[in-house]
Structures are given as structure tokens and as C-alpha cells.
Design a protein with these regions (language model features):
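C-terminal output helix
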Residues: 73-82
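Conserved phosphotransfer microenvironments
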Residues: 1-41
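Alpha4 helix (beta4-alpha4-beta5 surface) of REC/receiver domains from two-component response regulators
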Residues: 26-27, 51-67
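Short acidic, S/G/P-rich loop/turn micro-motifs used as interaction or catalytic elements
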Residues: 17-25, 51-55, 75
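CheY-like receiver
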Residues: 87-144
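Flexible loop/N-cap segments at domain edges
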Residues: 57, 77, 143-145
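Hydrophobic/aromatic residues positioned on beta-strands within the core alpha/beta folds
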Residues: 47-49
Length: 145
């Protein structure tokens, strides 16, 4: 679905232009997360927004982007944000209907905590240039009452 017959790259980024409409973004993320390759399914998907509001950012986090970068932003800041996807652990959530970064990561302390509606897996992933994408831990979590 993503146009990759044979895929040998260890570390891939998907950089998404701000002109993608919502349906195109949903399709891209669905196809990416269900690509059948760990290198693709857990590749960082980074959306560039033009002067996005906090609501725009939250909406796109909920869609499943790993990061949202507002442009214009200087090149050094963009490089720092992209580098943050490499060499550190990231929490991904896997449910029957979603695979992607933890959508609760922007919840603020004191904010009403959302509850898991179904059993899901928490996957800790690590991306490095040397090893590509690795699933470091997988923990099944029951739904909260």
C-alpha cells in the first residue's frame, strides 16, 4: 500500500506536508501502521503545520502523528525535533483499532485522565540508525474501571 516491494532501510521518517487533508492523513497513517514491517509500522510520522493552533496540534496527535512541527521554524529547531525520534524510547499503543504513539502524551497534570476503554498493549520502541526499530518491551494492560 505504501509502494515498497522490497524494503531494506533500517530507519525511515515520514514527513507530511501541511496541505494533506484529514482523510489523506488518516489513510497514510493507517497504511503506515499496518505496513507489515516493523521498520515501517513504527516509523516516525511527523506532520508539518502552518501556524497550527493548539487545537490543530491536539487533533493531529489524536490522529496518531509522532510529532507535529509548526512552520515557519528555524532549521536547527526542526533538526532537534526530528532527532528526538532517534536514540530514545517511545511509547506506542496497540488496540484493535489503533497502532501508534501514545495519544495521551500531551495530557497535562491535573487534567481529567482519560481511561482505556479496552485491553491494549503498551509497546516501548527504540529507533537507532544502527539497529533500526526495536520493540524493547510489550505489556498488555486491561481496561480501567
Amino acid at each position: 500500500a505504501l509502494g515498497h516491494e522490497r524494503f531494506d532501510h533500517r530507519l525511515v521518517f515520514y514527513l507530511v506536508h501541511f496541505d494533506f487533508d484529514t482523510e489523506a492523513k488518516k489513510k497514510l497513517l493507517h497504511d503506515l501502521r499496518h505496513a507489515g514491517s516493523v521498520s515501517l509500522s513504527f516509523a516516525p510520522a511527523v506532520l508539518f503545520l502552518r501556524d497550527g493552533t493548539p487545537e490543530d496540534i491536539q487533533f493531529n496527535v489524536e490522529l496518531g502523528f509522532d510529532d507535529i512541527i509548526n512552520v515557519p521554524l528555524d532549521g536547527r529547531a526542526i533538526a532537534t525535533r526530528l532527532a528526538a525520534q532517534i536514540g530514545r524510547e517511545h511509547l506506542y499503543i496497540e488496540t484493535r483499532h489503533y497502532l501508534g504513539p501514545d495519544r495521551h502524551r500531551l495530557d497535562t497534570p491535573g487534567q481529567t485522565q482519560r481511561k482505556a476503554l479496552e485491553e491494549h498493549a503498551q509497546l516501548t520502541i527504540l529507533r537507532t540508525p544502527e539497529a533500526g526499530v526495536q520493540i524493547v518491551r510489550r505489556q498488555v494492560v486491561g481496561k480501567k474501571q
